[in-house]
From Swiss-Prot:
Pfam families linked: ADK, CH_2, SPEF2_C, SPEF2_D5
A single BP term in Gene Ontology: sperm axoneme assembly
Pro residues bias spans: 902-913
PANTHER family (alphabetical): KPL2-RELATED, SPERM FLAGELLAR PROTEIN 2
Origin superkingdom: Eukaryota
Subcellular localization: Cell projection, Cilium, Flagellum; Cytoplasm; Golgi apparatus
Annotated region (Interaction with IFT20), positions in chain: 1317-1669
Protein name, UniProt field: Sperm flagellar protein 2
Subunit note: Interacts (via C-terminus) with IFT20. Interacts with DYNC1I2.
Expressed in which tissues: Predominantly expressed in ciliated tissues. Mainly expressed in testis, followed by trachea. Also expressed at lower level in lung, kidney and liver.
Length: 1812
């Protein structure tokens, strides 16, 4: 029950405090939870005044408020119950809650609230309850003590507890003191006893010493004393005894000899006789006699032996006595002799003896003392050993704990690192997921904007932002950008730059949005302008300072360089020491190098000694190393760089003070020190300041140490570098290359430049690595910690115990410091390694994988062997590489020697006549000493010869193999004499066929590299950067505006669509007219519905309504069309196209500006190369006009950029054109005509602008060519008139031949007179020089014009591409706008048609209802374009539905109705509440009810014909004994038909009742009764009649279940309770009385009781008894039927008996249970086996007591059912007991109905059929 209550409180009601069975009493002691329960059932309105406190006033308040509510519910509650609950008496709260649970469930079923319950109470009861409540409150206040009293009681109780504890403590202390006192007394007593014992022992020793010192001198005895005489007598006796003994021995020896002789003779005779008489009969012999004799002889021999022993013992005693006598005699003689000495001698003897005793005592004392000393020393030594062992053990424990703590700390740090890494990865994943969500939402947004057609450009931009990890949505606005932008604005700037760069790359490379359209696919894009690239990069190289590059060594070094890395205790130093034994290598440890550097500083290591050592090393090492110079140079750089931060404080102080003399001397002395000493000084200075040595200083120390190693000797670094910065600095210091700078150069080369260097190689060469190998000894963190612990343990165990204590303490302190430092640093070292190793691993593996990983978690020997094998393999690799390089160099040298021999000898160049030429001749010789690397000259020479190595190296990978060895790498000046060697002679030999000359800008073309003035690069390089930046920024800005404009267009078109849709959906007033018409229609009187005139009027009203609605639709259509025209006539499309055209014109302007700037740069460059003055170009650049967006009149001088007004074509002129409009398909829409005309005008403006820009470019190129020709004419006027075939041949071009010829003719005509006048003599050298200059000028002109033509083609191509893209962009924009306008028109038309159709539908519905003369009850809904009849809204209410009458039970076949049964029950209950009534009274009551039935309807009609005899017969069927009738059994039988239960159903019902009855009271309430249920339920298949006026069928079984509760319940209790066991005993009745008894026993015991096997006899007896008792002897047919039924039951019993289990009927049954089953009357009867009446209860009890005693239960304990059923009395009682037999009262009724009828069936058989 407690579990049910807890579940109800916690799960169903969910009270504020969780209740458990253990805390039930405590939880409800305050009354708060009871109030909360009542409040949840809306019975406690003042719950807010309840208190959760546990003080007395709170409890009193709570229970005072609870009392009226509990009494209202009918719960028994008074002050005693409240007091028990408050004092937490067990079970009281649970009982109250159970009653409350029942009452609340009953209240819940009734559905009444608390107020209704109060109003239902009489007024008197309410007043009385108020008075009771006041009295309850007073009594409860008296019972509950005040809180102050409770608090005082608690305080006093607490102090009493404290007093009790203190008293106990005092008693314990007193007992302890007493025990200590007794212990002290006991110790004192034992000490006194020991002291007395020692004193007594000491006294005894002294007395013994005194006694020993005293010498007693005996007196001399006379010979004639009595003692001497006795001794003489004894001697005589001894002698006699010895003589007798000797004689006896002799006699015995003789006798033994005789006996032995006789025995041997008898044995021989007996043997012979035995052999002869073996076969004879065994006759009488004298063996017994002989045996007796032998036995006597044996006894005599044994007696003799005993006597001999006694004799021998006696003789021995005599001999001993004799020897003692002789000894005493000798002592007496000695004493007598001593007695003869003098008294003085005796005194001396006593003194000597005393002295000897004293010496012995002293000696013994000394020995004892030494022994004590030795024991003490041993004890001290053992204590010291134990102390050291304990200390060692404790140290070992501490060490293990420390190691465990270190490991835990490491695991914690590792876990933190893992957690940090997890958080980092999680944040990255979360960020990526957020970006994915942003991308998804952005795509979804734009799918809505673009009707699921997202432009490719937008998606491409979003993907770029997503791949670069930037937010897709705008973080902040960039319109108002402050000086210090916020983080969000910086992110937006980064996004904008990224998209700008991507757009620019697409524009430059003509991919993506700027890919070539279909009409331009056949046009090949122009290639890069190689001439311009060469010019730009030559200018940049001239502007940069000269670089001194290191030269590669002639012979490669075989010395190996490497480093060994790993965690702490990974075995690096051990492995390197092992390698140093077998290989000539140097091991460099950074710690050792730093210490040596500091030590060198302390030792004042000077430069002189180091220089001598260096010279000696240089003399020994003949080959010059390249690395030494680089290292020293880098080292000096490091020193200078390191010196600056260290001397900052000094320089700051020097501003305030003048330097002292000491500081000057110190700085001078520091400069005299060696490099190592200087580095040591700086290191020490940093360490003294508490700082760590910087990476730069560490690298300097390492590089300095490496410089001191001979070149032929290899070196390995031990554990260095440890960080990526150290690795970078070390590589830069050792190789001279900075990998970051190289990567930056590579990135710079990849940056989008406008000019590409044709000679520069695209691949960046890999820098040489500082190491040949890097070896990692990989171990785990735990291994490192374990090795540290092992090393410390070994150091701890290796301490020697015999060393000096001072040295030992100092060494221990030092070791402890080192160990502590090691312990403190091991975690940081491991963490540092993990922090820096990933970057180091990437550094050593990316360009060239030189990293070797090795598992170092092996023993030392295996590790050293592995390292040795790896090192040998690396040495072999190094040697192979060095041999390969040397072979390659030798092959190159051979090629160099073979090439000069193959080339023909060139004639010597003419001697320079001017001093400038002498200057030009010197730089090649100087440069030849230091050849350049990477194809870049160190400094640009003033002549073209410097370009030769550049050409040769830069074109190796690009040119074909045929041109690989050509000598065209020489300068053009050197080529001219070779080609024109025959020009010396006047006779010109015929020239053989020469291949056509190469075109400028091709791969075979050799660029003109004539010297240029120094001012030209200084001016042109910034000018070119300005050109590039302005071009790139202009392109990016325009593309950005185009990109942002696309977003604006999409948003505007979407807003236009949605706005127009909302405009179409604006509300109208059609529904008001429809509602008004419907109200008027429904208000028409009923008598006018069929009138024809009325119908005509209604039709006319419908027509008026339709016309009015059509007018509304037409007006809305006109408004929508006007709205569409307003949207079309807006200037948005025109403004958008104008802005887009201006953007594309800006792109054309950028291309035009770039071309003009490039033309100007090339002109200045080549004029500078020709040593001409640059022209002053005062002409302004060409400007492309932009489109004027507004029509405001502005003055020309106010405009920075020229504007073109927009002119649209008139529609009249446009209609005359036969052109088919591509945008307007199908029917002509005149509203869109203006759009098409504007588009054609814009298209024409774009075409005109493009043609204008293209013509401007062509004119500029033509002007430049014309200017060149004019300059040539001016230069050739003073020249000679002789022909210059080389220049003419080099300058021939198809387009320019006619003007050249004309100008030459003009030149010839105009120059003939001067030639004739001046005819100086010209030498051959001057002619050759002039020819060379003319050829150079011609090459410059060709290269310049070729570069211009390249730029012209590229610009024209770009302009055409921009024009095509602009037209496509404008067409796409106009198409999108026109699509939207057409969509608006489509929506408008569809909506108008839908509205008209809905009006038609409304009209049809209205006409239908007019014709059918019916009202329209549901609302007609006409809104926008939708029309429907709203079934949820009715304009007038429905008529109320008919009420179904309640079900009524009808009489059927004489069965009593439930109402009749209840009436009978009430009458019988008033007369006989106990359930038993007299036989006569019962018959009289029934007779009165039958005869006096005046409209009461107590019985059905079939019962109304019963006579008194029939009623008496009916009573006799129900009689218990001769006089009593059980009226409950009568009503149970009268209520038939109901399903008779089987035994299993009865037991199951009993178990359900027991489960519901948690308190096991044996009774249940009505709610529990319904919850448990019976074996049958109400009829669930009741058919509900279709007619609502017809009542529902009566469910008799459901009402019977409720009637059975009313029949058997005890109504005296409140609420009524039902004894379910007693009820089931009634239901155990059966047509077979014996079967009914067994069923009742089963119900009483709670389990199935099996019948015994004696069935046939029992059945016969049963039938006879039944026949005897049956009152229907006149009707034999029912009796025969019943007998046959009994046979069937017998067969069923036999079947059941076969299935009886072995352990059947083992249940225990008590005396009370047996009496409950066999309940009888009060009439005593005789008891014998043949009595047909049941005995009374008193007689049953006596008989049952006797039965129990007979069966062995003396004290009436319960016995087994099987044992009880074997008793004959019980068997007789079961056979004869009729109370459990169902009487067949229908026989009486049938007889009364059919007095003469004989065709009715008997009731027993019908009952049996119903059961089956």
């Amino acid at each position: 029950m407690s579990e049910i209550l807890c579940h109800w409180l916690n799960q169903e009601l969910k009270v504020s405090q969780t209740v458990s069975p253990k805390s039930f009493a405590k939880a409800f002691s305050s009354g708060y939870l009871i109030g909360e329960v009542l409040h949840k059932y809306e019975l406690q309105d003042d719950f807010a005044e309840f208190s959760e406190k546990r003080i007395s006033s709170a409890k009193l308040n709570n229970f005072s408020r609870l009392e009226p509510t509990l009494h209202l519910l009918g719960v028994q509650f008074d002050q005693n119950v409240a007091h028990d609950i408050i004092t937490e008496k067990p079970g009281v709260a649970m009982k109250l809650l159970y009653q409350l649970y029942i009452a609340l469930q009953r209240k819940k079923k009734s559905g009444l609230t608390g107020v209704e319950l109060q109003t239902m109470q009489p007024l008197t009861n309410t007043k009385l309850q108020n008075m009771k409540s006041e009295a309850f409150r007073d009594r409860l206040r008296n019972l509950i003590p005040r809180q102050t009293d409770v608090s005082l009681m608690r305080v006093s109780h607490r102090f009493q507890e404290k007093y009790k504890y203190k008293d106990e403590d005092l008693v314990h202390t007193h007992l302890k003191k007493l025990e200590n006192f007794q212990k002290l007394q006991e110790e004192q007593r034992s000490f006194n006893i020991e002291k007395q014992r020692l004193s007594r022992r000491r006294q005894n020793e002294i007395m013994a010493q005194i006694q020993a010192a005293i010498i007693q001198i005996p007196k001399p005895a006379s010979n004639r004393t009595l003692k001497a005489l006795d001794a003489q007598k004894m001697m005589k006796k001894k002698k006699e005894a010895e003589d007798v003994a000797n004689e006896i021995k002799k006699f015995e020896a003789l006798i033994k000899k005789d006996l032995q002789a006789k025995e041997s003779a008898s044995k021989t005779s007996l043997d012979a006789a035995g052999q002869t008489t073996t076969d004879l009969l065994n006759t009488y012999s004298d063996d017994e006699y002989i045996k007796k004799i032998q036995k006597r002889l044996e006894e005599d021999a044994f007696a003799r032996e005993q006597r001999e022993k006694r004799r021998r013992r006696l003789l021995m005693d005599q001999l001993i006595a004799h020897e003692a006598q002789e000894e005493a005699y000798r002592e007496e003689q000695l004493v007598s002799r001593l007695m003869r000495q003098s008294q003085q001698e005796r005194r001396i003897a006593v003194q000597l003896m005393h002295v000897r005793h004293e010496k012995e005592v002293l000696w013994q004392n000394r020995i004892f003392r030494e022994k004590q000393y030795e024991e003490r020393r041993l004890k001290d030594f053992q204590d010291a050993l134990d102390r050291e062992a304990a200390l060692a053990k404790q140290a070992k424990i501490d060490y293990e704990e420390q190691a465990l703590r270190e490991k835990e700390m490491h695991e914690q740090i590792a876990a933190e690192r893992v957690q940090a890494r997890y958080k980092k990865h999680y944040s990255i994943c979360a960020e990526i997921l957020d970006q994915i969500l942003d991308l998804s939402t952005k795509v979804a947004d734009y799918r809505m904007l673009t009707n699921n057609l997202i432009p490719y450009k937008l998606m491409h931009d979003w993907k770029e932002l997503f791949f670069n990890g930037m937010p897709i949505y705008e973080q902040a606005s960039l319109k108002h950008l402050s000086a210090k932008p916020s983080t969000e604005q910086l992110i937006e700037l980064e996004k904008r730059d990224l998209l700008d760069n991507n757009d620019y790359e697409e524009y430059k490379n003509m991919v993506g949005e700027w890919a070539l359209p279909e009409e331009m696919v056949d046009n090949i894009p122009p290639s890069d302008n190689r001439i311009l690239g060469h010019v730009i990069h030559r200018l940049i190289e001239h502007s940069l300072p000269p670089q001194v590059e290191s030269t590669a060594p002639e012979l490669p070094s075989f010395a190996i360089k490497g480093c060994l890395l790993g965690k702490t205790f990974s075995g690096k130093t051990t492995a390197l020491k092992f390698l140093q034994k077998y290989f000539p290598i140097e091991v460099l440890s950074i710690d050792t190098l730093v210490q040596e550097a500091i030590q060198a500083f302390h030792n004042n290591e000077k430069v002189s000694g180091a220089l001598q050592l260096q010279k000696a090393a240089e003399e020994k090492a003949s080959p010059v190393r390249q690395e030494s110079g680089d290292r020293s140079q880098n080292l000096h750089n490091v020193l200078s760089a390191e010196g600056t931060p260290e001397t900052e404080d000094e320089t700051r102080l020097s501003t305030k003070k003048t330097p002292k003399a000491e500081e000057v001397i110190a700085s001078a002395s520091l400069s005299e020190l060696t490099t190592r000493a200087q580095l040591g000084a700086k290191s020490e200075k940093l360490l003294k300041k508490g700082k760590s040595i910087s990476d730069t200083l560490l690298v300097s120390i390492v590089v300095n140490a490496i410089n001191q190693i001979p070149i032929y000797k290899g070196w390995i670094l031990d554990g260095f570098p440890m960080t990526l910065n150290q690795a970078k600095l070390l590589e830069e210091a050792l190789t001279g290359f900075n990998r970051n700078l190289i990567e930056l150069e590579g990135k710079k080369s990849q940056i989008s430049t406008l000019a590409v260097d044709p000679t520069a190689s695209r691949e960046v060469p890999l820098p040489p690595s500082a190491f040949d190998f890097v070896m990692l000894l990989d171990i785990s963190d735990n291994t490192s910690l374990n090795r540290m612990n092992d090393i410390m343990a070994e150091a701890f165990l290796s301490e020697t115990p015999h060393e000096n204590i001072n040295q030992r303490v100092a060494a221990e302190n030092q070791d402890m410091d080192e160990d502590q430092n090691l312990r403190d640093q091991i975690q940081h070292r491991i963490i540092g390694f993990w922090d820096h190793w990933p970057s180091l691993e990437q550094w050593f593996t990316e360009p060239e994988n030189i990293l070797i990983k090795m598992n170092a978690e092996v023993d030392e020997q295996s590790l050293c062997q592995k390292v040795k094998e790896m090192f040998m393999a690396e040495i072999m690799k190094k040697e192979n590489k060095a041999k390969k390089k040397s072979e390659e160099k030798e092959a190159e040298k051979k090629e160099e020697f073979s090439l000069p021999e193959a080339t023909p000898p060139t004639p010597p160049a003419p001697p320079p006549s001017e001093p400038e030429k002498e200057k030009e001749a010197h730089p090649p010789h100087e440069r030849s000493k230091t050849p350049t690397a990477k194809g870049k000259p160190a400094s640009e020479p003033p002549h073209g010869n410097r370009e030769s190595p550049q050409e040769g190296k830069g074109k190796k990978s690009e040119t074909s193999p045929k041109r690989k060895g050509s000598p065209r790498g020489k300068s053009p000046g050197g080529k001219a004499p070779v080609k024109k060697s025959p020009a010396d002679s006047t006779d010109v030999s015929p020239v053989p066929a020469v291949p056509p000359p190469s075109k400028p800008g091709s791969e075979e073309w050799v660029f003109v590299n004539e010297p240029i003035p120094e001012e030209i690069p200084l001016f042109l390089v910034p000018y070119w950067k300005l050109i590039e930046n302005s071009y790139i920024n202009s392109i990016k800005t325009v593309l950005r505006h185009l990109r942002e404009g696309q977003h604006t267009v999409l948003a505007y078109l979407y807003d236009t669509r949605t706005g127009f849709q909302q405009f179409l959906r604006r509300p109208d007033h059609k529904q008001n007219f429809v509602s008004q018409w419907q109200a008027d229609f429904n208000s028409l009187p009923d008598d006018l519905w069929e009138d024809e005139e009325t119908k005509a009027e209604l039709h006319q009203r419908v027509n008026d309504l339709r016309d009015r609605l059509w007018d509304i639709c037409d007006a809305r259509k006109e408004e929508a069309e006007q709205e569409r025209l307003d949207i079309i006539n807006e200037s948005w499309l025109q403004d958008s196209t104008g802005i887009a055209m201006n953007h594309f014109f800006s792109l054309m302007q950028a291309e035009l500006n770039r071309f003009q700037d490039t033309k100007r740069l090339l002109q200045d460059y080549y004029r500078g190369m020709e040593c001409k003055i640059p022209t002053d170009d005062t002409k302004r650049f060409t400007r492309i006009p932009l489109v004027q967006l507004d029509n405001k009149d502005t003055l020309e001088f106010q405009l920075r950029i020229p504007l073109v007004p927009r002119r649209s074509i008139s529609p009249e002129s446009a209609l005359s054109k036969p052109k088919i409009k591509a945008l307007l398909k199908g029917n002509i829409d005149y509203s869109l005509e203006n759009v098409e005309l504007n588009f054609e005008a814009d298209e024409k403006v774009v075409m005109d602008t493009w043609q204008q820009a293209s013509l401007a470019v062509s004119h500029m190129v033509a002007a430049e060519i014309h200017q060149r020709l004019m300059e040539e004419e001016k230069e050739n006027q003073p020249a000679d008139t002789k022909e210059k075939p080389p220049q003419a041949a080099a300058n021939k071009k198809v387009k320019k031949e006619p003007p050249k010829k004309k100008r030459e003719d003009k030149k010839g005509k105009g120059k003939s007179p001067p030639m004739a006048e001046s005819a100086p003599v010209i030498t051959v050298e001057e002619i050759a020089e002039m020819e060379r200059k003319n050829e150079l000028r011609l090459r410059i002109k060709e290269e310049h014009l070729a570069a211009l033509q390249f730029e012209e083609r590229a610009t024209q191509f770009r302009l055409e591409l921009i024009k095509t893209k602009a037209l496509a962009f404008l067409e796409d924009l106009v198409t999108k706008a026109v699509d939207v306008y057409k969509l608006m028109e489509k929506w408008l038309g569809e909506r108008y048609l839908n509205e008209m159709a809905s009006v038609e539908k409304l009209t049809e519905v209205a006409r239908y209802h007019i014709e059918t003369s019916t009202k329209i009850q549901n609302e007609l809904y006409l809104d926008q374009e939708d029309f429907f009849i709203n079934g949820n809204i009715k304009v007038f209410p429905d008529p109320p539905p008919p009420v179904r009458p309640p079900p009524v039970e009808k009489e059927e076949n004489g069965t009593l109705t439930i109402e009749q049964l209840d009436n009978l029950r009430d009458q019988f209950l008033d007369i006989a509440p106990k359930g038993v009534i007299g036989n006569k009274a019962f018959a009289d009551i029934l007779l009165d009810l039958v005869t006096l039935n005046l409209g009461t309807n107590n019985f059905p009609s079939s019962w109304m014909h019963l006579t008194q005899p029939e009623l008496q017969e009916l009573a006799s069927l129900l009689v218990i004994n001769s006089e009593l009738v059980d009226w409950r059994k009568f009503l149970l039988v009268a209520a038939l038909p109901w399903p008779i239960p089987l035994e299993e159903e009865l037991l199951e019902t009993l178990q359900r009742f027991k489960a519901v009855d948690e308190e096991q009271l044996g009774t249940v309430t009505f709610e529990q009764y319904l919850q448990a249920g019976l074996w049958f339920t109400g009829d669930k298949d009741i058919k509900i009649p279709a007619n609502p006026l017809e009542p529902l069928p009566f469910n008799r079984q459901e009402h019977l279940i409720e009637f059975f509760f009313r029949l058997f319940a005890d109504h005296d209790k409140d609420p009524p309770r039902l004894d379910y066991t007693e009820m089931l005993l009634y239901f155990a009745c059966h047509p077979d009385g014996m079967e009914g008894v067994y069923r009742a026993l089963s119900v009483a015991t709670g389990s199935h009781v099996f019948q015994p096997i004696e069935t046939p006899v029992l059945v016969a007896e049963k039938t006879s008894s039944f026949i005897d008792m049956s009152p229907t002897e006149e009707y034999p047919e029912p009796e025969d039927n019943f007998i046959s039924e009994e046979r069937e039951l017998q067969e069923e019993g036999e079947e059941k008996e076969e299935d009886i289990p072995e352990n059947a009927n083992t249940e225990m049954i008590s005396m009370e249970t047996l009496l409950k089953v066999f309940r009888g009357g009060n009439e005593p009867q005789d008891t014998n086996r043949f009595a047909s009446y049941p005995k009374t209860e008193s007689i049953y009890s006596e008989n049952f007591i006797k039965v129990f005693q007979d069966l062995g239960s003396k004290n009436l304990e319960p016995i087994e059912v099987a044992v009880l059923l074997k008793h004959p009395f019980i068997q007789d009682l079961i056979r004869s007991y009729p109370d459990y037999k169902i009487p067949d009262i229908k026989v009486v009724l049938q007889r009364s109905e059919h007095i003469q009828g004989s065709d009715g069936e008997s009731s027993p058989s019908r009952l049996t059929e119903e059961k089956k």
